Amino acid sequence: MPWLQVRLAITPEQAETYEDALLEVGAVSVTFMDAEDQPIFEPDLGTTPLWSRTHLLALFEADTDETALLAHLALLTGGDLPEHHVEEIADQDWERSWMDNFQPMRFGRRLWIVPSWHAAPEPDAVNLLLDPGLAFGTGTHPTTALCLEWLDGQELAGRQVLDFGCGSGILAIAALLLGAERAVGTDIDPQALEASRDNASRNGIEPARFPVYLPADLPQRQADVLVANILAGPLVSLAPQLTGLVRPGGLLALSGILAEQAEEVRAAYSAHFDLDPTAEREGWIRISGRRRAD
C-alpha cells in the first residue's frame, strides 16, 4: 500500500507543536531526521536533543486529502506552515530491507560478527551471532569496530573482562568467544542489559560467564581487561573509577572518542597507564594501554 508523506523543515522549538498537530490530523507515524548532517555529541542524560534544522516526516494513508490536511495543520499550529514537501511513496518491507543491509563483518584475523539469520561465511572462524533488535551496537560503527579489532589482537585466554557500557554485549561476548574465561557487563540502560543477556544466550554463553549489572550494582572487582565504548566526557569523569577497575598489568581499551577529544582522554589515563599509539577510523579514536604497577 502506498503512503502520503509530508516533510516539514522545522526548528527544535517547533518540534513538539508540529508533532502533536500531525498526530492530531491523522498521521500514522512521525519521525525526526537531521536536515543538515549535523552530529549530536554527548547529550545530557534525560534529554532528547534535536538538530538546529530538523526534518519532520509524517506518513498518512494514501487517500488523505492533501489540501485539507495542510489547511488543518496550519490552523492547529496557528500560522503559515514552514517549508514543506508532500509526495506519495511506495510501501516496502522495512524490516526485510534493513536485514538485507546488515551483512556479516570481519574484524581482525579471527572474529566475524554474523546476523543471527545469516549463515556464517567461515564456519571455522570465531563467529559471534548478533540480533540487534534493540538499538545497540552491531559492529557497523567505527568505535565498535575499533574495539572488536583490538580484542581480536589480544591474548584473552583465561582473562577476566569488564565491558563498561555494554549495550548489546557485543564486546564482552566477542572477548568470551576469543577465549576469555569470564566477562562482566554494565550499562545504565536496563534494555541494554536485556539485549546483552539475549545475545549471550544466542551464542551459547551461560549467564554465570557473563553477568550484567546496572552501575550501582556492579561488583568492585578488578579485571584483567576493561573495554569502554561510551563517550569522551564520561571517560574523562570516570577515569579514577575505571582505572581502579583494572588490575596492575591489566589492559584498557577506550572508544567513543572524537579525534579532537583524544588528548583530553589520554591525559586522564596517562598517570596510571602506558598508552599505545592512538588508533583512528573515520574521525573516531581508540585509546588503549597497560596499567602500570602501583
Curated annotation (Swiss-Prot):
Gene3D superfamilies: Vaccinia Virus protein VP39 (3.40.50.150). It is found in: Cytoplasm. It catalyses: L-lysyl-[protein] + 3 S-adenosyl-L-methionine = N(6),N(6),N(6)-trimethyl-L-lysyl-[protein] + 3 S-adenosyl-L-homocysteine + 3 H(+). Keywords: Cytoplasm, Methyltransferase, S-adenosyl-L-methionine, Transferase. Its EC number is 2.1.1.-. Its main location: cytoplasm. This is Ribosomal protein L11 methyltransferase. Methylates ribosomal protein L11. GO terms for cellular component: cytosol. GO terms for biological process: methylation. S-adenosyl-L-methionine binds at residues 144, 165, 187, 229. It holds the Pfam family PrmA. It is an enzyme of class 2 (transferase). GO terms for molecular function: protein-lysine N-methyltransferase activity.
